[in-house]
A protein has these predicted regions:
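Cys-nucleophile CN-hydrolase/nitrilase-fold catalytic domain and related Cys-dependent amidase chemistry
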Residues: 19, 24-106, 110-112, 182-202
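A conserved C-terminal secondary-structure "cap"
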Residues: 257-277
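Short beta-strand scaffold segments in enzyme catalytic cores
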Residues: 85, 99-102, 142-144, 229-231, ...
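Short beta->alpha transition motifs characteristic of CBS
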Residues: 57, 101, 112-119, 230, ...
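Active-site catalytic loop in hydrolytic enzyme cores
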Residues: 91-171, 184-193, 197, 255, ...
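CN hydrolase (nitrilase-like) catalytic-core segments centered on the catalytic cysteine
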Residues: 65-84, 159-249
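Active-site-proximal beta-strand elements of phosphoester/diester hydrolases
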Residues: 5-17, 43, 99, 149-158, ...
Length: 277
């Protein structure tokens, strides 16, 4: 049976190019979350365990046998919660993917979604970014189940491609996770607008955990990310947003009744005219 409500901790990080430092930050944030709250799902941002700070830098690929997943599995069991790692550089059949990972309250570690749309862009006046130099493209959407809630997955740049979210809408997901590491320039212009649009058009909750702040790496690299981790309801209302720079979290309670209310008022699923294609 599906739970009527789902309590989520939407976590913001300032990850760097050092796994141990990032893992310590995740542990500290979990400790802070569970001091006063009992979320059933904790969501972390894209690149939570390793963030490349210098373009062209070699990214380490992790396998599920790595000790860091064992540690995160222990934490998931300890706190009796689902941990959603927004993305990690994961080796799958010898190839590197920017992949989400779900860790269940029983400690099971599951690679789930591989980022489909890779960030190969050239902003005016800035250096080119080519994510595809490091990663392979994922091939398909994915839907998780958390206590009966159907959860679609996307990662960062995916948010610009409405067709992915249209697929999730047609499958009537309850929630879409969009972990990210947005640039400041694109974040200021597009972050809020895109995420609210995706929630409204899919008539589902959208929870976007972000990297935010100034990242100073152990190898001398630096980077700025936009932050503004945000939770949005199916009507497009902002339930919570982290407006300060740096690590933090926001707790939100998602209601199945709210999803049903929105879909009853505006029954989009009966009005669709174009096929998926």
């Amino acid at each position: 049976m599906s739970a009527a409500e789902l309590v989520i901790a939407n976590v913001q990080m300032t990850s760097i190019d050092d796994v141990d430092t990032n893992l310590m930050q995740m542990e500290s944030l979990l400790e802070r979350v569970f001091e006063k709250h009992q979320p059933r799902l904790v969501t972390f941002p894209e690149n939570c365990l390793y963030l490349r700070l210098t373009e062209g830098e070699k990214i380490p690929g992790f396998e599920l046998s790595h000790s860091l997943f064992s540690r995160l599995s222990e934490l998931s069991v300890q706190y009796k919660t689902y941990l959603h790692l927004g993305s990690v550089p994961l080796l799958i059949e010898g190839h590197l993917y920017n992949s989400s990972v779900l860790i269940t309250p029983s400690g099971q570690v599951q690679p789930t979604y591989q980022k489909m749309h890779l960030f190969d862009i050239q902003l005016e006046g800035q250096k080119a970014i080519r994510e595809s130099d490091a990663f392979r493209h994922g091939q398909k959407p994915n839907i998780l189940e958390v206590d009966g809630w159907r959860v679609g997955e996307a990662i960062c740049y995916d948010v610009r491609f409405a067709e992915l979210f249209s697929q999730y809408a047609r499958k009537e997901v309850d929630l879409i996770l969009v972990p990210a590491a947005f640039l400041v320039k694109t974040g200021e212009a597009h972050w809020n607008i895109l995420l609210r649009a995706r929630a409204i058009e899919s008539q589902s909750y959208v929870v976007a955990s972000a990297q935010g702040g100034t990242h100073r790496g152990v190898r001398g690299g630096t980077r700025e990310t936009y932050g503004h981790s945000i939770s949005i309801d199916p009507w497009g209302n902002i339930l919570g947003e982290i407006t300060q720079s740096g690590p933090g979290f926001v707790i939100n309670t998602l209601s199945r009744q709210q999803i049903e209310n929105v879909r009853k008022q505006i029954p989009m699923k009966y009005h669709r005219r174009l096929p998926v294609g």
